[in-house]
């Protein structure tokens, strides 16, 4: 039971760390993705750094939990060889590195091609430049969720 909790804590912690790193970049590409595209509590100075920290945790802890519970069950229950959190660290880091590389590739391609998402996916208050940057963030986040 203790090892299962370690595995769940590991996946939640790594997910949050990934989310913070990811959102530190995307908040600087398009702050409107976070301020207009998402509900953010009032009375907080929403700088790109604060947004990246806040959304990096809020948007990813649950992904780590959803992945961690079945991973812990597979690693700790049944007749197959048991796996520790330590043994799972390297494969999880590899998964996050691949996910990050794919997401950043999507971000770069989106920006280089000036991709703009279909209008129904964008807030109406954005100008053309904001729409392209918002679209790049949208692509980057969707790649992270899809690959990860």
Regions found by a protein language model. Give the residues of each.
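Juxtamembrane non-transmembrane "cap" segments at the membrane-aqueous interface
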Residues: 104-128
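Perimembrane loop-to-helix junctions flanking transmembrane segments
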Residues: 32-49
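Transmembrane helix-loop junctions in multipass membrane proteins, especially transporters and channels
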Residues: 23, 27-35, 72, 76-80, ...
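Hydrophobic alpha-helical transmembrane segments
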Residues: 48-63, 130-148
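Short, membrane-exposed interhelical loops at transmembrane-helix boundaries
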Residues: 40-44, 119-140
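N-terminal membrane topogenic signal
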Residues: 1-11
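Cytoplasmic juxtamembrane regions at transmembrane-helix boundaries
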Residues: 69-94
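Hydrophobic alpha-helical membrane-insertion segments
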Residues: 10-22, 90-113
């Amino acid at each position: 039971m203790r090892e299962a909790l370690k595995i769940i804590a590991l996946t939640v912690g790594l997910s949050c760390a990934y989310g913070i790193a990811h959102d530190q970049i995307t908040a600087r590409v398009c702050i409107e993705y976070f301020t207009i595209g998402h509900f953010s509590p009032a009375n907080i100075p929403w700088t790109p750094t604060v947004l990246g920290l806040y959304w990096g945790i809020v948007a990813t802890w649950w992904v780590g939990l959803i992945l961690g519970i079945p991973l812990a069950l597979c690693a700790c229950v049944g007749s197959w060889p048991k796996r520790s959190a330590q043994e799972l660290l390297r494969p999880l880091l590899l998964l996050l590195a691949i996910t990050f590389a794919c997401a950043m590739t999507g971000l770069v391609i989106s920006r280089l091609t000036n991709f703009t998402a279909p209008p129904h996916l964008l807030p109406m208050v954005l100008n053309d430049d904001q729409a392209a940057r918002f679209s790049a963030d949208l692509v980057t986040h969707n790649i992270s969720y899809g690959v990860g």
